[in-house]
């Protein structure tokens, strides 16, 4: 493993930001630290960078324990959420800043900066100031400045949070391509699930200072190891009594059920006959257009489920009584998530 955290603990007063955190990252991987606010993901990033010190445990980078190594000597590039560019420096000087601090040769600085300017797609804008750039361009300059000293590890704290939605989507793709091209080991913090899915090779789910799960986006989404991951990852509905749905086995000690939109099919009343015995009656509470599909909120008893309906199908309307078919559910048992299948249905409707 290129980066390893072993039994890391960090407390701020009564708040435990890191609770016996351990994980490893292979060289060249792009890792997403994903979790809700206050889950400890930024603390992990800052401890790896050397901006915070763990109370106990070891941080290992490329085989070396770096707990006592100053941040400036860890070979790390750090991209901050708010860019942290120098307002009165040009694009060129912002990117060159770290190299000048290292007292690098002027010729090398110029070659390195111009190479990075071309890499980030801002050739010709070297003399502009941050105020003359768009949010997306400023973030690219921040990336280049972090990369200028040729770090072996790149850390990014909510790198797209301050950018509008359209530019954010473009930058995600750009960042992934850039990191693949450079082959640099990278870790980014995000609370955006779509961002983590699209950009990361692997995701680490954080919750209350602990690591809930680590794996590829598909592994974590399809096979959540804990009740928290099952409920956090993806759009979900939580049901107190899953026996309201037909044809699901009972889980001894089962508590609540978690249902994702892709586990649910909503049809007009009596439209689907093949699995009629699995139908539960519901009432459409909301219909929202989502481009390629309609997003539905359907009340079944005391529960509101999220579902999707294709634009190719006859639309349902708010207030309409419909048939609801639930094909899969996660049942929580302590902090375990148990996947159950509707025993009367086939896999035809499951789309992930």
Across the structure, where does each feature detected by a protein language model lie?
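The feature captures the beta-strand-to-loop junction immediately N-terminal to the Walker
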Residues: 34-36
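Non-catalytic connector elements of ABC transporters
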Residues: 236, 247-352
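Helix-to-loop junction immediately C-terminal to a conserved catalytic motif
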Residues: 49
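ABC ATPase nucleotide-binding domains
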Residues: 30, 71-81, 85-225
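Conserved ABC transporter NBD signature motif
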Residues: 57-65
């Amino acid at each position: 493993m290129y980066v390893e955290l072993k039994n890391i603990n960090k407390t701020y007063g009564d708040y435990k930001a890191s609770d016996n955190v351990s994980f490893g990252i292979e060289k060249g991987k792009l890792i997403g630290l994903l979790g809700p606010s206050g889950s400890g993901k930024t603390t992990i990033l800052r401890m790896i960078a050397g901006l915070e010190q763990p109370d106990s445990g070891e941080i290992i980078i490329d085989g070396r324990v770096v707990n006592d190594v100053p941040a400036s000597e860890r070979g790390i590039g750090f991209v901050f959420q708010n860019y942290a560019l120098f307002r009165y420096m040009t694009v060129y000087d912002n990117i060159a800043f770290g190299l000048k601090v290292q007292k690098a040769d002027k010729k090398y600085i110029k070659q390195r900066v111009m190479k990075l300017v071309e890499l980030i797609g801002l050739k010709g804008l070297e003399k502009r100031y941050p105020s003359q750039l768009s949010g997306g361009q400023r973030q690219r300059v921040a990336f280049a400045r972090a990369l200028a000293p040729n770090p072996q590890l790149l850390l990014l704290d909510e790198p797209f949070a301050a950018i509008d939605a359209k530019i954010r989507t473009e930058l995600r793709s750009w960042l992934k391509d850039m990191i693949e091209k450079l082959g640099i080991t990278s870790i980014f913090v995000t609370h955006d699930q779509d961002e983590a899915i699209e950009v990361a090779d692997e995701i680490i789910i954080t919750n209350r200072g602990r690591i809930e799960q680590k794996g590829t986006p598909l592994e974590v989404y399809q096979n959540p190891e804990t009740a928290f991951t099952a409920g956090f990852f993806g759009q979900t509905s939580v049901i107190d009594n899953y026996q309201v749905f037909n044809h699901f086995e009972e889980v001894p000690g089962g508590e609540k059920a978690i249902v994702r939109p892709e586990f649910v099919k909503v049809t007009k009343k009596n439209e689907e006959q093949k699995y009629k015995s699995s139908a539960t009656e519901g009432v459409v509470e909301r219909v929202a257009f989502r481009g390629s599909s309609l997003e539905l909120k359907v009340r079944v008893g005391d529960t509101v489920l999220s579902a999707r309906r294709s634009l190719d199908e006859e639309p349902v309307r708010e207030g309409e009584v419909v048939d609801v078919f639930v094909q899969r559910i996660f049942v929580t048992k302590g902090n375990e998530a148990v996947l159950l299948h509707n025993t009367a249905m086939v896999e035809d409707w499951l789309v992930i």
